[in-house]
């Protein structure tokens, strides 16, 4: 590929959205990038974001003032699988979900409009777990078979995939994997 995406496609997708009220589940929303991007856009829609994050971040963000006129945000510690969303946005986080197959199958069971899986380490390899050095700690990290992800989300159709270059130490590049077999990269 001669192109890469540096952030989520969700804000651009909303430009062609016809609905006046849009519900978004933002799983692994981290620093609330989606909220801030949408808040800066001239969108004539009401957007409600359920931001699903770990408890420490939810507790931190609940103390802040995030809402603006068009975009409202709720902070949740667990994904609401019973709620129907227009957009389910999973970015930079699926690789840390231990029971990821069950998680995706529960999402698949609902009638969401779109599911966006952004910055997930996936390819034509088998799914495997390794360790990642993360702020001085080693944590489990899953590398996915893209075919297996598609099987878990069989009520949806894969419409686009691209190489994602992540910003690592200030430089956009692919994940360093020289220590893995070539078939697993």
Report each predicted region and the residues it spans.
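N-terminal accessory regions of S-adenosyl-L-methionine
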Residues: 1-23, 32, 135-136, 145-146, ...
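Conserved beta-strand signature within the Rossmann-like core of class I S-adenosyl-L-methionine
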Residues: 111-125
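Class I SAM-dependent methyltransferase core
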Residues: 26
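Class I SAM-dependent methyltransferase SAM/SAH-binding core
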Residues: 29-74
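Short acidic low-complexity segments
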Residues: 73-84
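A short, conserved alpha-helix within the catalytic core of class I
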Residues: 96-110
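A short SAM/SAH-binding and catalytic strip from SAM-dependent methyltransferases
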Residues: 87-99
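Conserved acidic residues
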Residues: 22, 86, 113
């Amino acid at each position: 590929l001669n192109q890469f995406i540096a952030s989520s496609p969700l804000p651009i997708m909303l430009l062609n959205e016809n609905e006046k009220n849009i519900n978004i589940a933002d799983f692994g929303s981290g620093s609330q990038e989606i909220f801030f991007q949408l808040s800066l856009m001239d969108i004539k829609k009401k957007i409600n974001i359920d931001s699903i994050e770990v408890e420490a971040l939810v507790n931190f963000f609940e103390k802040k003032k995030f809402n603006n006129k068009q975009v409202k945000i709720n902070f949740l510690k667990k994904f609401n699988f019973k709620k129907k969303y227009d957009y389910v946005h999973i970015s930079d986080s699926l690789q840390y979900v231990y029971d990821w197959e069950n998680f995706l199958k529960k999402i698949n069971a609902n009638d969401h409009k779109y599911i966006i899986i952004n910055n997930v380490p996936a390819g034509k390899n088998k799914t495997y777990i390794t360790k990642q050095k993360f702020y001085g700690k080693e944590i489990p990290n899953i590398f996915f078979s893209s075919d297996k992800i598609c099987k878990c989300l069989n009520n949806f159709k894969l419409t686009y995939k691209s190489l994602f270059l992540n910003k690592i130490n200030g430089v956009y590049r692919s994940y360093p994997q020289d220590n893995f077999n070539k078939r697993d990269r």
